[in-house]
């Protein structure tokens, strides 16, 4: 199907370009979203009369996106999720989750603006690209951790998924437990031992 683009669309074309796309892509996405018109004579004339308004509206959206980008670019957001010892999440962090996290911080982001090739399934720092406008893209960091304290440690550069870290943490816990058991055993011996008289 031939269509007229009403805005710049990555890997497709610029505003005003007449391009050929698959029928389903046009019918299900581009036309309902108002990103394109069918390329017939009536729509070509309509586009030419509305071109100045469309360009002005596009410029306005771009400037709004740039204002948001200045505040949001490089920001870090924390996602607390349950994970196993190796850092494998029990679920995943999807575009919907990321959109909720960023929106909770006061920014209006839709899940369709998040470029994520696959869901996040490991704890760690993940750089995500946000497309605020076809011409404005920024990067944010999603810090996926088991707790906020772990997220802070990760932000400081500590890796929480390496075998050394896991075993060191387990050894520390074992040492603490052994110390507690020794203290309890000593206390029990003091209580249970009969007092010897001299």
UniProtKB/Swiss-Prot annotation:
Name of the protein this chain belongs to: Large ribosomal subunit protein bL9
A Pfam entry, by short name: Ribosomal_L9_N
Residues of the signal peptide: none
PROSITE patterns cross-referenced by the UniProt entry: RIBOSOMAL_L9 (PS00651)
Keyword Nucleotide-binding set for record: no
Protein's UniProt keywords contain Ribosomal protein: yes
Name of the gene: rplI
Function recorded in the entry: Binds to the 23S rRNA.
Organism taxonomic ancestry: Bacteria, Pseudomonadati, Pseudomonadota, Alphaproteobacteria, Hyphomicrobiales
InterPro entries: Ribosomal_bL9, Ribosomal_bL9/RNase_H1_N, Ribosomal_bL9_bac/chp, Ribosomal_bL9_C, Ribosomal_bL9_C_sf, Ribosomal_bL9_N, Ribosomal_bL9_N_sf
Gene Ontology biological-process entries: translation
Entry GO CC: ribonucleoprotein complex; ribosome
Molecular function per GO: rRNA binding; structural constituent of ribosome
Record keywords: Ribonucleoprotein, Ribosomal protein, RNA-binding, rRNA-binding
